[in-house]
Amino acid sequence: EFLGVPDPLLKSSWEHCSDIVMQADTLGFDNILLPSGYALGIDTTAFAAAIATLVKRIRLLMAVRIGESWPPQLARQIATIDRILGGRLTVNIISSDMPGETMDSEPRYRRTVEAMHILKTLLNGEPLDHDGEFWKLKLDPPPIGMVSGKAPPLYFGGLSPAARDAAARGCDVFLMWPDREEMVKGIIADMTARAARYGRTLRFGYRAHV
C-alpha cells in the first residue's frame, strides 16, 4: 500500500503484477514500467511476454539488466515481445550489479554502452561487427525484427558522472525522479550538453509511482 513498506499481499506474483498492468491498460495509461531485480521475484522478460498477450493499448517499458542475457539473445527477446505487442515495446536499460556479484561502476557503465550499441545495431536490422571490451561479435541481425523495423527507444536513468556519460552515449530517453524545478533544469541542461558532444539528442521523462 505504501512505497517502501513490504506487504505480503502485494508481493511480486503473476496475479498481483498482471492485475496492475491490466488496470493501467483499462484506465488509459500510455506506458508502464516492468521493473527488473533478483529480489523482486518474477522474471521481467517472461512476465512481459505473458502480459503482452493480454493488454490492448498500453505500451510496456521492460527493464533489462545488462549482463543477465547475451546481447544477441536479448535482441531476439525484445523483438519477439514487440511483435506480440504489435509494436508497443520500450526498453529500460539497467546497469546495476548482478545478484551475488560486484563490479566497479566505471566498467559496468562501459559494458552498458557496449550492450546498447549491440542492441541498437541488431534491432535496426543491421549486421554487427563489434570488437569491444566485453563482447566481440560478428553476426547478421536476427531473422525476427521490430514491428517498426527500428530499435525501440532505450530509456536510462542515473545521476553519477559515469551513468550520465553512458546515457549521453547510448540511450534515447533519460529518466529522472521528480525534483525541484531548478534541479530538473540543471540535469536537463547537463545531459543535453553531454549528448551534444557525441552528436546526439535526448528526450527526457519522469519516473513516478502511481
Language model segments and positions:
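Acidic-and-aromatic substrate-binding clefts and catalytic sites of carbohydrate-active enzymes
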Residues: 35-43, 67-72, 180-186, 210
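The substrate-binding groove and active-site-proximal loops of carbohydrate-active enzymes
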Residues: 7, 61-68
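Internal, glycine-rich beta/alpha segment that forms the wall or movable "lid"
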Residues: 2-6, 73-173, 181-202
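Residue-level signal for the nucleotide or nucleotide-sugar donor/cofactor binding architecture
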Residues: 12, 68-69, 107-110
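Alpha-helix-loop-beta-strand connector modules within alpha/beta enzyme cores
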Residues: 42-62, 111, 122
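A cross-family glycoside hydrolase active-site/sugar-binding cleft signature
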Residues: 35, 61-63, 92-94, 155-157, ...
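N-terminal beta1-alpha1-beta2 module of alpha/beta enzyme domains
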Residues: 1-54, 131, 149-152
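Receiver (REC) domain switch/active-site residues of two-component response regulators
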Residues: 30, 172-175
